[in-house]
Structure formats: C-alpha cells, structure tokens
Swiss-Prot record:
Keyword Nucleotide-binding attributed: yes
Keyword DNA-binding on entry: yes
Binding-site positions, ATP: G616, P617, N618, M619, G620, G621, K622, S623
PROSITE patterns: DNA_MISMATCH_REPAIR_2 (PS00486)
GO CC, one annotated term: cytosol
Cited InterPro entries: DNA_mismatch_repair_MutS (IPR005748), DNA_mismatch_repair_MutS-lik_N (IPR007695), DNA_mismatch_repair_MutS/MSH (IPR017261), DNA_mismatch_repair_MutS_C (IPR000432), DNA_mismatch_repair_MutS_clamp (IPR007861), DNA_mismatch_repair_MutS_core (IPR007696), DNA_mismatch_repair_MutS_N (IPR016151), DNA_mismatch_repair_MutS_sf (IPR036187)
Name of the protein in its database record: DNA mismatch repair protein MutS
GO BP term, pick one: mismatch repair
Protein role: This protein is involved in the repair of mismatches in DNA. It is possible that it carries out the mismatch recognition step. This protein has a weak ATPase activity.
Family label: Belongs to the DNA mismatch repair MutS family.
Biological source species: Aeromonas salmonicida (strain A449)
Length: 851
C-alpha cells in the first residue's frame, strides 16, 4: 500500500506520481518516464501479474524501496489491449512540460483514461462487435438501464419491472463495462462479469442526470427525446454520461440524442432463448456455427455490427419489415448486391472513424480512410441513380456525397501518412506555403553538409574527413586520429572515439541551430494544420454520421440479398392472422455444417392447432425442428428471407425456449431448478402471440413428478395461455392430450431399424411415435453390449409391470401437492394497494359466492 500521509518524505518525482495516483485510485496509472511507461507500488504488482511483466524495485522513497514495473512506450497499445480484454482500466500520464525550463520534475498530466466500455482506439476494439458501456439502477420499484456505444454515438435507455428482463438485456447488449450504484441489491445478476464498476449513489441522482443530458444535447428539457417521464432510466443515463465525460476528458459532439427503447416494438427474447438459439454465440461460448456466422458476409465492420443488433432485437413493425423485404428483393432482381458489396468494402468502418474524429483522437490514417470512403460515394450514387425503388432511393439520399471534404483531404493529407502526427510527414507538400519553406530548409541540410564537407577536405588536405550527425551531439566533423595533427586551430573538439576525433566549427553550429529550429517549427505547424483539419470536419459530423448509418444499413440489406440467393432463402409473407405456416423449413446453421442433405420439414400452427406434441427418438431431430422454427420466425422479424420453400407468419410478440439445462453452481441451483425457473418465466410471461419451445420438461426429477409437471405445463400453455407451442417429450402419456383437449396435435420423427443399426429419418410426420429407440441410441454411443442386453431384460420387466406403459395412469390426477382452493388462488392474485374501495367490496362478494 502507498502511504501518502507524509508525502513530503517522498522524492519530488514520487510526490508528483502520488498526487496523480490519488486522482485515479482505482485504475492502473501508466507514468511516462523517457522511453517507458512505469507503474509503481500496488499498480506495479497488479500489472506484473496481469501483463506478465517483470516486477523490480528501484531506489527508495520515504525510506522504502519502490516496487516498479514498466513497458516500452512504443508497445503500449498491445499491453492496453490485454488489459481491456481482462476488464481493467488504465490512465495514461504523459510529460506536458518542457524539460529545459522545468524546475524539478517535468510537469505531467493524465491525458486519457482507457476503460473497456469507453475505448475508441482501433487497435483495442473488435471491429465486428459493438463495444457498449451500460449502467443499471433500481429505485425500489423498477430497473433503469442505459447503454452507450462511444464508437458510434448511439445512446439508449430502458426501464422495466422484472429481474428476468434485466438478465435478458444484459444478454442482449453484453456490455464491456457495467456501472451500478453502491446500494444495488441485485448483485447476484451481475457478479462474475468483467468490467464491473461500483459508483457512488449521487451519480444516479435524477436532477443531476437531467442537467447533464440537457447540457450534452443543448436543450432546455428532454421532452423532445420522449424520455422525460422515464425517470428511473434517466438516473442510469446520468451516471453513464458523467462517467464517459470523466474518462474521455473532451467534448462528445457525436452523442447527439438519447432514445427510449420500447419493449412493445420488439419481439422479446429472454436470456435463455438467446443462448439456446445460438444467435451470435454458441453454447460453448464461441462464434462458430451460430446464426450470425452463417448470415454475416457484410462488406464493412459497421454493417456486421448492425446485422448482429438486428439479430438480437427482431422488430414487430410490419411497415419496416416489409420495407426491408422489398429492398432485398429489389437488390436481387436488379443484381445489385455484388457491386454494392465491392464498393462498400472500400468504404470501411466510417462509423468508428467519425467517433475518433468527434473525440479528437483521430489519427492521420483515419483521415485517409475517410478520404477513401468519400471517394466511393459518387460511384455508389451512380450505381443506384437509375433505381426507382423508394427504399433504395431513400438510402442513397441518406448516403450523401461530400465533394468539398474529399477535395480538402486529397489536398491536405499524404497518400500514405505515418501512424502518428507526432512523427510529421502527414500534411501534403503544396498545401501550406510556410510549411513547404520550413521543410525545404530542414530537408536542404544534406546538400549544405556535402558542400561544407568538400570545402573542409580541400582546406585541410584530409581526404577521409566526414561531416555527420547524431541525436546526442548534433552535427560534427569527423577526422581519423592519424590525421588529427592536420586539424586547424578553429576546430573545437566535441567527442573522442577510439580511432576518430569529432569536431565542431561555428558555421556548422549555426547551421545546426537553423536546421533543428526549422524541423521543430515544421512539426509544430504541421500539428496546428492537422488540428485545423479536424476543426473543418467536425461541423459536418451529424451529416457524416447519417451517411455512415445509411451505408451500414445498405451493407446489411445487400448482404441479406446475397445470402438469400446463395443459400436459397425465400421471402416470408407476414400476415395478420394467427398462424405460422412453413413449407419445407430448414435449420439455417445445421444445413451448412451437415455433409448429408438436410431433410426439410413443414410446420403448421394456427388457431385450432396451437400446440404440437413432438415425440421420437433421441438424435431424431426434435430439437433441430423446434429451433429451426424459432430461427425462421426470428429471421422474418428482422426483414430477412428464410430457409424454407414458403412461410406465412402471423404476429409474434415473444419467443421463449426451454431447451437443455445444466447446473448453475455459482448460484447454487441444480439442473432441475434451472429448468423450473425458465419454465416459470414462460408460464408467467407468454401470451397467445408468443412462440414457445419446450423440450423435455420434467426429466430432471422422478418419473411421476416429471410427468405431472409436463402434463400441467402443457395444459396451461394450451388452454389458459394459448401460445404457439412446440412441446417435445419422452413421456408418451402426453400424446393423449390431443384426445382430451382441443388445439393440440401429435407429430413425430421416426427411425428405422436395420439389424443392429438404426437409421434416423429426420422427417416430421403426423401422429405420435411408436417407441423411443433409447437402447439403440445407447448402442450407437458405444455402451457395452452386456449392458444393452441387461437393459433389454429390464425393459421387458418394466413394460409388463408398470402402469405407465399400459396407459392406466392419468397424469393430471397424480397428487403431487395439495390442490389449492379457488378462493386461495383468487386471494393470491389480488394486489390490495391497487384496488379501489368498490373493487374491494366486489371482491368480497365474489369470494363469498365461491365458498
């Protein structure tokens, strides 16, 4: 630990360090010393472990050795990238004073703070994934949740009542950094995440949030953004804005608005559904064999990020969806998607370049990327000029051209500039007369030095005499020691080497001062011109962001057109009737990884057929069939074409899945508890317009308990909720449900035995399966034959003895728990604080009649 109580006991340099560290106590401080960034004390110990760098000790301060670790200044980006991946933050401290005029340590300042959620440096970001920072707040009644993408300026807020929704939002947005108040009572939902930041309560104060946001947007109030009444969400947004301002230490002109996300505008998916459908991450945590991997052939990183946002937030607005479908169809019919893709590949990641421009951290090569993008826009306009499709024209208009800015960048910036402005050589020759003159003076040194060298050779008669330069001693005349007796008296010795002597003369010293002054002046002028370039671009930021947004959307639509043509997808029909009708549907991911042809299957769900009881052997394809239905419905709700011969899809508000489970050891929940929690979420939140996938409910407990729960869940979904439901089960007793209730049907996936082998047909057929083929699957898995034979004998015994096999059990009547009285059910559903006196009186009379 650092003791700063007696700071005067420390050396002046360590006093400076400790003062800066006190301003940034919770993050690693990289302190510039010469060609290294140094870390001291606890920071050094922590960095040595995280970055695998040496921990040493240097001298003493306040009587104690100083633990120290360091990294070369030119390699800092690689170390920062590693820290960001680990969820850590860093403060970069640079020398800002002039060593020549400084008394004591050179003045240093923290010039930037890098955190996982606010990083904008290209080298520290994954280019095809959003990098979000989020804040969560709970006011005792509801949650407020805000997200910001500093790389694009997108700023969203949301508020909701349920913990399940918080989990779903965290799964959907996957923030790199999450801010939460000190009193946050739901830490169990965020523990284990990287980038957690606990913030003081006052940062979530509503009045402060309103003031901060109004200052940022230059408005009197927040009414125009439609967020004024969302007070809990605004508390989270205020903390978010304050944190970003504190870390960036500059204006944020690209953050121009905040939007309230409306749950009723989206097809809602909980965390389990996103995980089970493997949208952008597979069950093992990777990217391979996900929906995004199959769909994403976008030409630009910003298009790739937009596609993933669409996948994670399917929408219900039929006008927008049909507009996307129509645009995709147009790009296919006019064969435009390939040419568009080729042009857009030259555009690159304009969105993040503009963010760095707004933050004034844009590097010279960012400007060349902008120049390259601007150069493609006229060609893109020509490509789309003759197209009369309304949506295509609107996108073309939004992706406007910027000829003046293109001309400026072509005149101002070198074709291939260096990485950093501090290296010079960024501004093109001919752009500024004063800069050209200074460069001529600095670059003319070679010719002048040759002239001086030839003259001195002639005057001294020393043919081996050389004029040279190094950074330590400047310009010099070098003479071999053997010829040193020939050196004139006005030569002043500057350096003695083993075999040579180095001298200086007045003319060379004056020329050195002149050249070095010209170089310094040229670099200072070049930096000023570069800043002026940024100043010229910044007023166009809003238009540039709008153009980047249109280019990203055009990229996604062209990509979806290419995917539809390449993968044989068809345009789904969005209908108003309660129906899901898919002909020859396919799983978009499984069909790409299979070596054998994929067996396409139909599905029909409608008012009189809202639940399918699905039976069949393990490995028969039940889960694939269920998931493909959900993915086809999801694709239809991002406006994409779908893997099917045809699809008619009615209104959907939510997609739920209860497929597979594992222990949640961190929360102390068993597999069965996880299964029941997910099931409860479905039963409490599904509606008649929800799509529900239920796979093997009840298998984590005893046969009778599991069967009873499965039966009751199926009844609830079918009769009370009326959701579109695919209910896969090994409880063959459930196949009796269609006989007992309306709106249900049996389907099955069959298999055929050939001697000791089994062939799975993968084709969905009407009716219930005749058997499960469990022993055959066990044999395929390599279970020893002796075990299989013993299992066959046991199966025969059970089939002859158990009432389950003979159909004698009526699962709905199995007494698991005491059946509650209707009056108790009614009372449990009552919310007393929400009842008017009249409603309370009516309730009393209603309860009395129920006794």
């Amino acid at each position: 630990m650092i003791n700063i109580e007696n700071i005067q006991q420390h050396t002046p340099m360590m006093q400076q360090y400790l003062g800066l560290k006190a301003e940034n106590p919770e993050i690693l401080l990289f302190y510039r010393m010469g060609d290294f960034y140094e870390l001291f004390y606890d920071d050094a110990r922590k960095a040595s472990q995280l970055l695998d760098i040496s921990l040493t000790k240097r001298g003493q301060s306040a009587g104690n050795p100083i633990p120290m670790a360091g990294v070369p200044y030119h390699a800092i980006e690689g170390y920062l990238a590693k820290l960001i991946q680990l969820g850590e933050s860093a403060a970069i401290c640079e020398q800002v004073g002039d060593p020549a005029t400084s008394k004591g340590p050179v003045e240093r300042k923290v010039i930037r703070i890098i955190t996982p959620g606010t990083v904008s440096d290209e080298a520290l970001l994954s280019e095809r994934q959003d990098n979000l920072i989020a804040a969560v707040y709970h006011d005792g009644r509801r949650f407020g949740y805000g997200t910001m993408d500093i790389g694009s300026g997108r700023f969203f807020i949301n508020q909701f009542d349920k913990e399940e929704t918080l989990l779903a939002e965290l799964q959907r947005t996957n923030p790199a950094e999450l801010l939460y108040p000190e009193s946050f009572a739901f830490l169990q939902h965020v523990e284990g995440r990287r980038g957690l930041r606990r913030r003081p309560e006052w940062e979530f104060e509503l009045g402060t949030a309103r003031k901060l946001l109004c200052q940022q947007f230059g408005t009197q109030d927040l009414v125009g953004f439609g967020v004024d009444k969302s007070e809990t969400a605004l508390c989270a947004a205020g903390c978010l804005m304050q944190y970003v301002k504190d870390t960036q230490r500059t204006a944020l002109p690209h953050i121009r608005s905040v939007r309230l996300e409306q749950p009723d505008h989206a097809v809602i998916m909980d965390a389990a559904t996103r995980r089970n459908l493997e949208l952008t991450q597979n069950l093992a945590g990777g990217y391979e064999n996900t929906l995004a991997e199959v769909l994403d052939r976008t030409a630009t990183p910003m298009g790739s990020r937009l596609l993933k946002r669409w996948i994670h937030q399917p929408i219900r607005d039929r006008v927008i969806l049909k507009g996307r479908q129509s645009t995709i169809k147009e790009l296919i019919e006019q064969n435009l998607y390939d040419e568009l893709g080729a042009l857009l590949r030259q555009v690159g990641d304009v969105e993040r370049v503009l963010a760095r421009l707004a933050l004034r951290s844009a590097r010279p090569r960012d400007l060349t990327r902008l120049r390259q993008a601007f150069a493609q826009l006229p060609e893109l306009q020509r490509l789309l000029a003759d197209n009369r499709h309304e949506a295509v024209q609107q996108l073309a208009e939004r992706a406007s051209t910027f000829p003046e800015l293109l001309s400026l960048l072509e005149r101002a910036v070198m074709e291939v500039p260096p990485v950093l402005i501090r290296d010079g050589g960024v501004i093109r020759d001919g752009f500024n007369q004063e800069l050209d003159e200074l460069r001529d003076l600095a670059n003319g040194a070679t010719a002048s030095l040759v002239r001086i060298e030839e003259r001195e050779k002639a005057l001294t008669g020393i043919n081996t005499l050389k004029v040279g330069y190094n950074r330590v001693h400047g310009f010099y005349i070098e003479v071999s020691r053997a010829n040193s007796h020939l050196v004139p008296a006005h030569y002043i010795r500057r350096q003695t080497l083993k075999n040579n002597e180095r001298y200086i003369i007045d003319e060379l010293k004056k020329y050195e001062d002149k050249v070095l002054t010209a170089q310094a002046q040229a670099l200072a002028l070049e930096k000023r011109l570069y800043e002026e370039l940024l100043d010229t671009l910044l007023p166009h930021l809003g238009d540039l962001q709008e153009s980047a947004s249109a280019l990203a959307e055009l990229d996604v639509l062209a990509n979806l057109a290419e995917r539809a043509e390449t993968l044989d997808y068809r345009c789904p029909t969005l209908i108003d009737e309660d129906q899901i009708l898919i002909e020859a549907g396919r799983h978009p991911v499984v069909e790409q990884v299979m070596s054998d042809p994929f067996i396409a299957n139909p599905i029909r769900l409608e008012r009189e057929r809202r639940m399918l009881i699905i039976t069949g052997p393990n490995m028969g394809g039940k889960s694939t069939y269920m998931r493909q239905t959900a993915l086809i419905v999801l694709l239809a709700h991002i406006g994409a074409f779908v893997p099917a011969d045809s699809a008619h899809i009615g209104p959907i508000d939510r997609i739920f899945t209860r497929i597979g489970a594992s222990d949640d050891l961190a929360s102390g929940r068993s597999t069965f508890m996880v299964e029941m929690t997910e099931t409860a979420n479905i039963l409490n939140n599904a509606t008649a317009r929800s799509l529900v996938l239920m796979d093997e409910i009840g298998r984590g407990t005893s046969t009778y308990d599991g069967l009873s729960l499965a039966w009751a869940c199926a009844e609830q979904l079918a009769s009370k909720i009326g959701a579109y439901t695919l209910f896969a089960t090994h409880y063959f007793e459930l196949t009796r449900l269609p006989e007992l209730m309306s709106g249900l049907a049996n389907v099955h996936l069959d298999a055929v035995e050939h001697g000791d082998t089994i062939a799975f047909m993968h084709a969905v057929q009407e009716g219930a399966a005749s058997r499960s083929y469990g022993l055959q699957v066990a044999a395929l898995a390599g279970v020893p034959k002796s075990v299989i034979n013993q299992a066959r004998h046991k199966l025969a015994e059970l089939e002859s003895a158990t009432p389950l096999a003979t159909g004698e059990v009526r699962p709905a009547s199995i007494p698991l728990l005491p059946q509650s009285h209707p009056v108790v059910d009614e009372l449990e559903a009552v919310r007393p604080d929400e009842l008017t006196p009249r409603q309370a009186l009516d309730l009393v009379y209603r309860l009395k009649q129920m006794l």
